[in-house]
């Protein structure tokens, strides 16, 4: 079968690889779409050392069940089901798994399967979930990033009447904007230097969109909140300047969530006195724990189709990665079939 294989640092190629075989508890899936995660190009370039070549890339997937192992019978899955899945499998017995922190499972590295930018993938039944009726394959492959956004919102203390600022309007920022509004935020300000991304966020319901390249984000934010600062600030761009600016936007007793991958050597200047005097809460978001059931229930509430900027066939995956790095698109999909 064809697959997008990360061969070595900065080398991604479409290659012929053996078609995977399903074990007793596995589900074999014909992959329809994989969404490029913002972290994927950084992994290939070697600037995010969370995985190592050779490896099939991709983890945000939708597809169709084509085979079930003889013991894959606990979820009622059947051949022909439209599915998505969690790219990692949890052991269920380590301290993290038993404490609701499955995303830090001690066996993640052992259970991390091959990627989904391929014609077929085999995942353990535990990882596979049926898509809700009415959710397309194109929307369904965004389930994993939606689950991580749900984790971010859970940590962000957004509540009825909150003021929220979101910096960075890629797929994550656009989904977070919708979740903030669903969570009861009264006013949402967003920021991104790309005009089309700002326009889409306004269509999603944001109250104000700011271009941080030409406007003073702090001054605009203070005017927006009556000089109080925001109850919640979520930094989702990964830009170093945005990470610094976000700290100044948070109001007293507010929550700041860093929801992006930053360079490993980037040090954020922060005064502990400000944490004390303003009673701030600062959090990071890594991955989502067991949130897929909640996520799937929420998919019909979200506007996901407008987030898909472009679709590339699997044979053009290298071009798609270059497009992703240009930072002009929101979500780019790889079509595995046809």
Question: What residue ranges belong to the model's regions?
Answer:
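N-terminal glycine-rich cofactor-binding segment
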Residues: 3-21, 38-67, 84, 98-114
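C-terminal hydrophobic helical "lid"/dimerization subdomain
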Residues: 3, 215, 244-248, 289-338
């Amino acid at each position: 079968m064809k697959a997008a294989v990360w061969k070595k640092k900065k080398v991604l190629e479409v290659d012929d690889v053996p078609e995977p075989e399903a074990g007793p508890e596995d589900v074999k899936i014909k992959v329809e779409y994989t969404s490029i995660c913002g972290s994927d190009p950084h992994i290939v370039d070697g600037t995010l050392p969370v995985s190592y070549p050779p490896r099939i890339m991709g983890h945000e997937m939708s597809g169709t069940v084509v085979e079930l192992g003889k013991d894959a019978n606990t979820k009622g899955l059947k051949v022909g089901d439209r599915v998505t899945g969690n790219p990692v499998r949890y052991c269920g017995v380590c301290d993290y798994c038993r404490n609701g922190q499955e995303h830090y499972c001690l066996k993640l590295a052992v259970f991390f399967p091959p990627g989904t930018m391929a014609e077929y993938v085999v995942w353990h039944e535990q990882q596979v979930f049926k898509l809700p009726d009415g959710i397309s394959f194109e929307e369904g492959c965004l389930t994993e990033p939606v689950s991580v956004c749900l984790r971010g919102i859970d940590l962000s203390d957004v509540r009825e009447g909150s003021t929220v600022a979101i910096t960075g309007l890629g797929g994550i920022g656009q989904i977070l904007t919708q979740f903030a509004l669903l969570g009861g935020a009264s006013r949402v300000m967003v920021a991104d230097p790309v005009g089309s991304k700002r326009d889409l966020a306004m269509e999603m319901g944001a109250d104000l969109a700011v271009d941080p390249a030409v406007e003073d984000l702090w001054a605009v934010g203070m005017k927006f909140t009556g000089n109080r600062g925001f109850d919640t600030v979520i930094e989702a761009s990964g830009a170093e300047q945005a990470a610094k600016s976000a700290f100044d936007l948070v109001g007293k007793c507010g929550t700041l969530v860093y929801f992006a991958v930053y360079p490993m050597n980037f040090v954020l200047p922060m005064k502990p006195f400000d944490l004390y005097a303003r009673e701030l809460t600062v959090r990071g978001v890594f991955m989502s724990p067991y949130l897929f059931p909640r996520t799937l229930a929420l998919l019909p509430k979200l506007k996901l189709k407008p987030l898909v900027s472009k679709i590339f066939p699997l044979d053009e995956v290298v071009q798609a990665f270059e497009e992703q790095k240009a930072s002009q698109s929101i979500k780019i999909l790889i079509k595995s079939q046809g």
